[in-house]
């Protein structure tokens, strides 16, 4: 019989490593860059991920061409089911899709949405959004 003794910190490190491996690795491109590509794509986990031109054209109408794609939707266990969106342009886009008012003079660059809203966003922008997961063991 083998008895393994680990501290909570060790367990936390292991779990964080597992979550990190689950999350996609990607480099974001600007809307401008993607619009100029014949076959718009980003590399996610070493594989080519096609971006639908229809989504890019839609985003061009509601956002700056400096918008970084994919838009990151962060699922954080410490947020009780909320999904975090960061970045001024990203917040602007998600707000418009959900029909939420935003103060254009606000410096706020973070917003939180919930699962029903996430479904709306993912339906509208399936190839230009990316879910990532963040695990918080100790809040």
Swiss-Prot record:
Pfam families for this protein:
DUF61 (PF01886)
Which top-level group of life is the source organism from?
Archaea
Do you know which InterPro entries this protein is assigned to?
A: UPF0216
Sequence intervals crossing the membrane: none
Q: Which family does it belong to?
A: Belongs to the UPF0216 family.
Name it. UPF0216 protein MJ1224
Query: Native species of this protein?
Result: Methanocaldococcus jannaschii (strain ATCC 43067 / DSM 2661 / JAL-1 / JCM 10045 / NBRC 100440)
